Amino acid sequence: MSEQYAALRGNVNLLGQLLGQTIKDAQGQAILDKVEEIRALSKSSRSGNENDRKTLIKVLHALSDEELLPVARSFNHFLNLANVAEQFHTVSRFNDVGFCQLNPLTQTLKTLATKANNGQLNHNHLADTLSKLHINLVLTAHPTEVTRRTIINKHVELSDCLASLERTDNLAQEREAILNRIAQLISQAWHTDDIRRSRPTPVDEAKWGYAVIENSLWHAVPRFLREFSQHVKEHLSLELPINYSPIEFTSWMGGDRDGNPYVTAQVTKEVLDHGRWMALDLYGRDLETLSTELSMSDASDELIALAGQEFEPYRCVIKTLKNQVLETVMHLGAKIKNQRSEAQDLITDINQIKHPIEVCYRSLLKCNMKVVADGLLLDVLHRLNSFGLRLAKLDVRQDSSRHGDVFSELTRYLGLGDYNQWQEQDKQAFLLTELNSRRPLIPKRWQPSPEVQEVLDTFDVIAQQDEQTFGLYIISMARTASDILAVQLLLKESGCSFKLPVAPLFETLDDLNDGHNVITTLLDNDWYRGQINNTQNVMIGYSDSAKDAGMMAAGWAQYEAMDKLVQLADKRGIELVLFHGRGGTVGRGGAPAAQALHSQPPGSLKGGLRVTEQGEMIRFKFGLPDVALQSLNIYAGAVLQSNLLPPPEPKPQWREVMALISEESCEHYRNVVRHDENFVPYFRMATPELELSKLPLGSRPAKRNPTGGVESLRAIPWIFAWSQNRLMLPAWLGALTGLQAALAKYGVETLQEMSLQWPFFRSRLEMLEMVFSKADSWLSEHYDNALVEDMYKPLGVTLRKELAEAISLVQSLSPQKSLLADQPWIKESIALRNPYTDPLNVLQVELLRRARSSDNGSEGDIDNALMITMTGIAAGMRNTG
């Protein structure tokens, strides 16, 4: 690595040395020597030494069954430690040259202040945009987090230790104690099972999400709001109100039942109880501290009236509130455990906590104790506004076909025919008639099938809660207006007393292209306009559209869908909230946050940002308070910049170019993935797709249809499999064909102009550059040589040739003629991990060969080592699905 990353390199070396000592103590010198030999060969191979590459393959293939597991674990642990060091480096005091050297939010506010002072930006517009800033981060349980929570907790403490080591005033014995603690944590992690032995339940996943909030975001959000307010005051001379709350959290964990039969109505109720229990427990801890701190006696009349004639009115109010909170915590704890309890459910509304806290705050201000008011008390108010009574609201998601099945059974029971066989106009007419009717539709004596009853039970759970509990009801695979109206009718039939926003999820190429027509049909209806409170939520699917059409075509379809929806919303005078269902990988829409937001159509963030944070990306972006603070700054700065300094409207010719790229790339992608009869057998042989099912990643099954082929495979295992063999195919297949067609028709100058002036197109190329830097043809070829039958090998040769040509073409479009020249941090990050990921790939090939051979089967150490290579490669790639 270059000298500018010396601090990072030093931490990586330190952790690596201590891991080496752990391996020696646990496995013996011989295993450590073998690991060091493999590491040296891998580094030499990365430098271009072909002989050492061949030796590396030979050494790894010659490992005995007894050596497989410790060697695989060694490289897996090193990659996890490298990730700890890298994540810490982003917030290290020595990071003066990384991608985060300056607070991106501060830089944005400075730019806005300059433009406002120069008359380029209207002050009122600036203040209004700030007041409407809204960022909703949606934590999802997509099974891409492969690291066990117990290991993650040790890694969090390791990061704290690295921070302690940076202190310049450490005494020698203090430094020695820190190093000893690091050694203990590394040893603890080594002697802990790397792999979950059972799949997490939906409740387990929800607990994991709540733990991220408890350990990181609970601390980061008040800091963010405090610093944000200070920066706004300093740079823009604006005072933000104390109830200013631009950050909100939502969860899919326990609410996303699309394709997951384990998320039942009962599970959703249990998860809601868990969320309220944990939130109140955290508030209880804050109230305990406040009751110690707020010992003052000077108080406002408002507080005295609330406290009575108490000598210490603040303590009186806080202690009363604390006791109510703790009693509710006891009640919920017993309920979760199915135990009886005398404790009562006292706190059921957030205002029961917020009101007395606000009274205390106002009293302190009135009594000239602002410095006290702006301490923990203000932090608690910020938490109440951001986390509410359940830490995160819950989204409910279900496939559109499940709602159709409800009405299909019901209409057949009522003698009206089969709803699923009706024309779209007939469905809409039926649904709107029932929505406008005052009588119930569902007969009390009707006994639906268990599948339909489960859907109805979910709506009953929604109806039993208040409107602060849920975020959205999301309809996956939404295609028509009737899909949305069907959910509205089910909400009505359940007796839901509030207007829960319903969002269609447009996720295939055709559905994205037709999305604005669906919303137009809905907005043409008076009943619907009256139902939505002038706000329309639409979710844009990135994963399935990329799997359906390839990354280039999907990216353009997403852009056009958003652009048309923005224009429609402006024309109809409604607020549009676009919800981005991005994954961590390029193949599922992933990109650095600021880059992704700047590349969206102008006006697409006026309604705020709502975006999924999935799997391992939650840990990478929010796992530590300092890192979470940085991520919140990036999001806030990017949203403000996009709304106040929007990207340019693309020229008509640029749209023509993208339409051509989209059409040509999609056709080529589908010709390979859908129409080449050799593709599916090749995919199954060249990747560990079949073996991935043994890895207990998440509660949701890997396939929508267990007997189906690639088309039924979920986007996550589809991406995971290709990232394992380093071909990274879903993220680039078709790009070469599309770009070549554009070059032939429009010339290189046009594409270079687009790259320079249009953030959307530039982001497409930068995402390709990142993928190409992670892809590796020699490793893909090695998988093919060892695992693929001869008749299917030519396809692999063709794909690797296409990859090489695509890399060359994208490099030629870069001003520096090299990959990631403008993203040196990402380039260094990949280079840091490659020498440790490569051996795991080579080892995985050998393990797959042994596991698939009829003699060995896949048992014991081979099975364990194979799963460890999967988790290790995922750590090396820094994303899985």
UniProtKB/Swiss-Prot annotation:
Highest taxon in the source lineage: Bacteria
GO cellular component: cytosol
Keyword Magnesium: yes
Pfam families associated with the record: PEPcase
Catalytic activity reported: oxaloacetate + phosphate = phosphoenolpyruvate + hydrogencarbonate
InterPro entries: PEP_COase, PEP_COase_bac/pln-type, PEP_COase_Lys_AS, PEPCASE_His_AS, Pyrv/PenolPyrv_kinase-like_dom
Cofactors (names): Mg(2+)
GO biological process, one term: oxaloacetate metabolic process
Active-site annotation: H142, K547
Keywords assigned: Carbon dioxide fixation, Lyase, Magnesium
An MF annotation (GO) of this entry: phosphoenolpyruvate carboxylase activity
Known EC number: 4.1.1.31
Enzyme class: lyase
Lyase recorded as keyword: yes
Family named by the database record: Belongs to the PEPCase type 1 family.
Matching PANTHER family: PHOSPHOENOLPYRUVATE CARBOXYLASE (PTHR30523:SF6)
Record function comment: Forms oxaloacetate, a four-carbon dicarboxylic acid source for the tricarboxylic acid cycle.
Protein name: Phosphoenolpyruvate carboxylase
Organism (species): Pseudoalteromonas translucida (strain TAC 125)
